[in-house]
């Protein structure tokens, strides 16, 4: 039986990066939980911004620097930067720390696995055909520069009595090659028939390591 490894975890320090940059021996677990709470807070309140990644840095015990990678940064920035001020104040009120915020625009959101997975989940929840949604996502990713993409959905697809798994793969997907830059993410669609799981792998090319 084949053993599966997380595509991003497999490449950490080579072609993929950690989602946080800090070290603390005594408060490691506390900071780790707080990082996740910060990410959940931002994604929940600014879901329409198309947030693919929230990178957290802690230069000292009191300050937290947050870099937000978004497909629609204007929603976060707001008019004359008012949105950033509002977000910073909300974070400081909820987490009792000083926050610095940096917004980075994603040039090709169609090749971000997390955004593709979330988009598919939202469309399936709205009763769109999972086959059409998957094929359109694959076409869009390849058109925007992806070298290969695989999408897998599992569950009671189209309301079927028996759960099953279906997947589409187009292009290359060299999962065993460490220099290959592979983005991976998962999402869940909650339908009246039950939960449908979505997994997305996107191959973006090779990187010198």
UniProtKB/Swiss-Prot annotation:
Ranges for domain KH type-2: 38-107
Gene Ontology CC, one term: cytosolic small ribosomal subunit
MF terms (GO), sorted A to Z: mRNA binding; rRNA binding; structural constituent of ribosome
CDD domains linked to this entry: KH-II_30S_S3
One GO process term, biological-process aspect: translation
Keyword annotations of the record: Ribonucleoprotein, Ribosomal protein, RNA-binding, rRNA-binding
InterPro entries membership: KH_dom, KH_dom-like_a/b, KH_dom_type_2, KH_sf_prok-type, Ribosomal_S3_C_sf, Ribosomal_uS3_bac-typ, Ribosomal_uS3_C, Ribosomal_uS3_CS
Role noted for this protein: Binds the lower part of the 30S subunit head. Binds mRNA in the 70S ribosome, positioning it for translation.
Assembly description: Part of the 30S ribosomal subunit. Forms a tight complex with proteins S10 and S14.
Family stated for the protein in its record: Belongs to the universal ribosomal protein uS3 family.
Protein name listed in UniProt: Small ribosomal subunit protein uS3
Species, as recorded: Fervidobacterium nodosum (strain ATCC 35602 / DSM 5306 / Rt17-B1)
